[in-house]
């Protein structure tokens, strides 16, 4: 999938670049967090060719041995270069057991400009102050907006863009499929993963079918007011 410029998020990242804060990029699965981090890494390298970017992507099998906080910390420290800007970027950080201990230690050393991404099923805003001892800046990423969808699909007609956006949605990973049924299947799979794996696992929900029905109720009634007993009714 090709990259597009997402200026809203790139501007947010640029404003905190180089700060001592831990930059945390959150968002639902497949909304474009990793691609955004990739684009921002390219921008940082372009602006400062001497910068040392230490990039760990836990989506890639080659980084599986680092999925424990001691190993992750050791890897980053081994790749540190004295005398230049050292930037740490860790994709899907929640896949590393005890990741917060590695991040807190790296942050305490005051040697790194730190960026991490993670699913907000595991990194909720309320969790950040508990997990990290240093100050965090959260940048929440959403699926493509109508403007981003239009730019990606190179659609100039507002009416056509809106009609297609309503039908196809903002999940960028679905755009590689030309067949509408394949796109729908992709989005359904993402939804199933969010509900039945991420949310259920995080909150230890035993009744998966009830959880699924509750989510379907909320999606079907997104414009209505409801109280907590409503989904049960």
State where each predicted segment sits.
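Conserved lysine of the Walker
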Residues: 33
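Hydrophobic anchor at the beta1->P-loop junction of P-loop NTPases
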Residues: 25
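Interdomain hinge/linker elements that couple catalytic modules in large macromolecular machines
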Residues: 3, 142, 146-228, 232
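Hydrophobic positions on the alpha1 helix immediately C-terminal to the Walker A/P-loop
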Residues: 36
